[in-house]
């Protein structure tokens, strides 16, 4: 089996989730000046009516690395809420973060809400009073470490990176699960990985590997003639198409579709990367009611029940009964993202081994105010 099977999180497992960085003290010395809201009492249908009265439009900046990578989410949202018109502009999280900073500095914010990787940016925006606090329905069911206690932001889905393998090229029993498995001569010329110095999530993976295996691991890995790409989704796509057999810098559903050409599996011994993807509404949002509807829908049971990996709600079961219970520590990833000096040093160190990243931004999105 690729995951543990139990009906719900144990207290011990939940304690692991809350390791390292409680949100209550994460923002810094500046006080949170805005009033902490009560939990939303309106239903999704009532929120829908309010959003339509506001105009029915919504602009979201979403983290990702495939063009129009949230098209399915847009379609599902518009179908669930007739009359709404949502646009989720997908770009690399690091680019969206600085894009939002630039827009705020210019006094013209283009998005109403955002869900991107950089939780350190959300902490800063909260401290600067840039976020509109909101606690959607079901707030009390969201794991405590997946939400800001003041309602400034909350996790809307859980992502994990681990092995993805092509099922026609590698059997599950032979698939590499731990970092050392990727050094097996059988996988020479068959590995695709994301540039770690281009992606903070993958950078964390390599930080963990080097801390456990030493820098000699990089020399051995490079002898495998790895193909390096920009973005985790392009790495997964290369495996799905059969261009390469394996990667460990990608995500995938815990339960693969029957016709899938790839499969996602967790390590046997190593720890693995996981994090709740944070989302927030901006204080200067042009469509705050629509943004509240969107966040409420994302964390609703009807959406969380369809999670590809783990839900953010404790009252929702994971696919196949899998639980978030071993060898993963989201709090450590949060602390890692906040130490920007260490990140920059690690990027430079890895670039000395791998070389400068090559290729364009895979989303094709450019500029401070990109065309939506």
Protein language model regions, located:
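N-terminal secretory signal peptides
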Residues: 1-25, 34
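Extracytoplasmic "Venus flytrap"
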Residues: 36-45, 54-72
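Conserved C-terminal helix/tail region of periplasmic/extracytoplasmic solute-binding proteins
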Residues: 40, 335-372
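Extracytoplasmic ligand-binding site segments that recognize negatively charged/polar headgroups
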Residues: 59-74, 87-101, 108-243
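A ligand-binding cleft/hinge motif common to bilobed small-molecule-binding domains
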Residues: 120-124, 245-263
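Periplasmic-binding protein-like
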Residues: 144-145, 158-161, 187-198, 218-222, 228-229, 298-320, ...
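A bilobed periplasmic-binding-protein/Venus flytrap-type ligand-binding module shared by bacterial periplasmic
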Residues: 162-169, 207, 275-287, 306-307
């Amino acid at each position: 089996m690729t995951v543990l099977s139990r009906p719900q999180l144990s207290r011990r497992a939940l304690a692991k989730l809350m390791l390292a960085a409680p949100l209550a003290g994460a923002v810094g010395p500046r006080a949170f000046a805005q009033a902490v809201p009560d939990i939303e009492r309106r239903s999704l249908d009532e929120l829908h009516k309010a959003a339509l009265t506001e105009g029915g439009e919504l602009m979201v900046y979403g983290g990702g690395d495939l063009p129009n990578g949230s098209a399915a989410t847009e379609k599902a949202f518009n179908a669930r809420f007739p009359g709404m018109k949502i646009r989720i502009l997908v770009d690399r999280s690091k680019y969206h973060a600085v894009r939002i900073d630039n827009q705020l500095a210019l006094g013209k914010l283009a998005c109403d809400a955002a869900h991107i990787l950089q939780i350190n940016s959300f902490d800063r925006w909260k401290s600067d009073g840039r976020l509109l606090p909101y606690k959607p329905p079901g707030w009390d069911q969201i794991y405590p470490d997946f939400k800001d206690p003041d309602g400034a932001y909350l996790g809307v889905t859980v992502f994990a990176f681990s092995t993805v393998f092509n099922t026609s090229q590698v059997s599950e029993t032979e698939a590499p699960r731990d970092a050392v498995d990727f050094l097996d001569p059988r996988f020479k010329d068959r590995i695709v990985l994301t540039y770690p110095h281009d992606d903070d999530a993958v950078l964390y993976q390599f930080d963990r590997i080097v801390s456990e295996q030493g820098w000699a691991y990089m020399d051995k890995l490079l002898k495998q003639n790895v193909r390096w790409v920009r973005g985790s989704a392009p790495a997964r796509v290369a495996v799905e198409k059969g261009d390469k057999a394996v990667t460990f810098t990608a995500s995938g559903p815990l339960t693969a579709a029957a016709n899938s050409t790839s499969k996602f599996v967790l390590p046997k011994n190593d720890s693995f990367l996981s994090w709740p993807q944070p989302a927030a509404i901006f204080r200067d949002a042009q469509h705050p009611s629509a943004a509240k509807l969107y966040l409420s829908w994302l964390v609703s049971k009807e959406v969380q029940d369809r999670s590809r990996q783990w839900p953010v709600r404790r009252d929702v079961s994971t696919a196949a009964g899998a639980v978030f219970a071993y060898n993963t520590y989201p709090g450590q990833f949060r602390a890692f993202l906040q130490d920007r000096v260490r990140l920059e040093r690690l990027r430079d160190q890895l670039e000395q081994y791998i070389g400068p990243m090559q290729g364009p931004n895979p989303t094709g999105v450019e500029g401070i105010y990109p065309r939506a």
